[in-house]
From Swiss-Prot:
Its EC number is 2.6.1.9. Pathway: Amino-acid biosynthesis; L-histidine biosynthesis; L-histidine from 5-phospho-alpha-D-ribose 1-diphosphate: step 7/9. GO terms for molecular function: histidinol-phosphate transaminase activity; pyridoxal phosphate binding. It comes from Polaromonas naphthalenivorans (strain CJ2). InterPro entries: Aminotransferase_I/II_large (IPR004839), HisP_aminotrans (IPR005861), PyrdxlP-dep_Trfase (IPR015424), PyrdxlP-dep_Trfase_major (IPR015421), PyrdxlP-dep_Trfase_small (IPR015422). It holds the Pfam family Aminotran_1_2. Gene3D superfamilies: Aspartate Aminotransferase, domain 1, Type I PLP-dependent aspartate aminotransferase-like (Major domain). Homodimer. This is Histidinol-phosphate aminotransferase. The modification N6-(pyridoxal phosphate)lysine is found at residue 227. It catalyses: L-histidinol phosphate + 2-oxoglutarate = 3-(imidazol-4-yl)-2-oxopropyl phosphate + L-glutamate. HAMAP family: HisC_aminotrans_2. CDD domains: AAT_like (cd00609).
Length: 365
């Protein structure tokens, strides 16, 4: 059989934006048969009894119908779980990625821009690019702290529509200084912009901004259930003042959360103590893994408030290939930003997975 031609017809190609043609689709690493420590997933599955109970519940859903008002039950449950302040509202997305894209869509005004520290989550820049908004990246300091002076200067110069602050940051896994964050939030507010605090890794962090967001009318708090333990469900949520959420919600596609997604999320929140225990295990394993990594000659490990640890090795490409050859999959981020030269991002797994990682890493250095 002749393989189909993979070259796009020039007449069709001209319909595709030039900047899109120059991009690459998001690549997912092949992980079959590997110890998978590349994507910051919860390493724990649901206990068998709960898995069976969830299966029965999903099997009873009317999949021939569009999602109904039960999605509002989920919104209320999430608001309760996150202790949403009075006068605030909550918006759901098909993962945080959709919420980030919808923010760019809603804030696409003439001269609008998006600002974020770098290195950071790639979707902040990508959403801006796809929406035709200017993206301003401000480098962190060499020890991955916010460069307050550079951030304030960029805010004053560009007056960004949206400023993202990941708390903790991906891929550096650290929580930034609270006073610096507050100064940035105030500076953005004076310029009439929005600040989005991205708490994707909140289940593993020692602090949250949730208790402080009611101080400001221009701050949104975004989270995801992916790190909670439901990466396969794809559900993110964003909280903010009611009037602000109401405007952004206008660009949300109808029925963007499937009945399967919101029923899984409701089930998880009903059993939140199970997921909280899993998160605490990850935090405990993170400490063990950090100490072991720090003891390896030639390895620099950074303290983490997430379910990942950033390390620097003598040769990232060699270490990555050595780990992959030994059936351990991690993320080589050494080309992502100059500050990340020879850096690898390791997801914290179970005790057994972390032991396999350490056994494979030492001979790979």
């Amino acid at each position: 059989m002749t393989a189909p031609d993979s070259t796009l017809d020039p007449k069709l190609k001209k319909l595709i934006r030039q900047d899109v043609q120059s991009m690459h689709a998001y690549a997912i690493q092949e992980s079959s048969g590997m110890v998978k420590l590349d994507a910051m997933e919860n390493p724990h599955r649901l206990p068998a009894g709960l898995q069976a109970e969830l299966g029965q519940r999903l099997g009873a859903l009317a999949l021939n119908r569009y999602p109904d008002g039960r999605v509002n039950d989920l919104r209320r449950a999430l608001a309760d779980y996150a202790q949403m302040p009075e006068g605030f509202d909550i918006m759901l997305g098909n993962g945080s990625d959709e919420l980030i894209a919808l923010l760019a869509l809603a804030c696409d005004v003439p001269g609008g821009s998006v600002l974020a520290p770098l290195p950071g989550f790639v979707m902040y820049a990508m959403s801006a690019q796809l929406q035709g908004l200017k993206f301003i990246g401000v480098d962190l300091t060499p020890d991955f702290e916010l460069d307050e002076a550079a951030m304030l200067a960029a805010i004053a110069e560009h007056k960004p529509s949206i400023t993202y602050l990941a708390y903790p940051n991906n891929p550096t896994a650290n929580l930034w200084d609270d006073a610096v964050i507050e100064n940035i939030i105030n500076a953005v507010g004076e310029q009439g912009g929005l600040v989005v605090i991205d708490e994707a890794y909140q289940p593993f962090a020692s602090k949250s901004y949730a208790g402080r967001m009611a101080r400001h009318s221009h701050v949104l708090l975004m989270r995801t259930l992916s790190k909670f333990g439901l990466a396969g469900v794809r559900l993110g949520y964003m909280m903010g003042p009611k009037a602000l959420i109401a405007e952004i919600d206008k660009v949300r596609p109808p029925y963007n959360i499937s009945v399967l997604n919101y029923e899984c999320a409701l089930f998880a929140l009903e059993h939140r103590e199970v997921f909280a225990a899993q998160a605490q295990d990850v935090v405990a394993q993170r400490a063990v893994l950090f100490n072991a990594l720090s003891a390896l000659p030639g390895v620099k490990a950074w303290h983490s408030d997430a379910n990942m640890i950033l390390i620097r090795v003598p040769d990232a490409a060699r270490a990555f290939e050595g780990l992959r050859n030994r059936k351990v999959l991690i993320k080589n981020i050494s080309k992502m930003h100059p500050l990340l030269a020879n850096c690898l991002r390791l997801t914290v797994g179970t005790a057994e997975e972390n032991a396999q990682l350490l056994a494979a890493l030492e001979p790979s250095l």
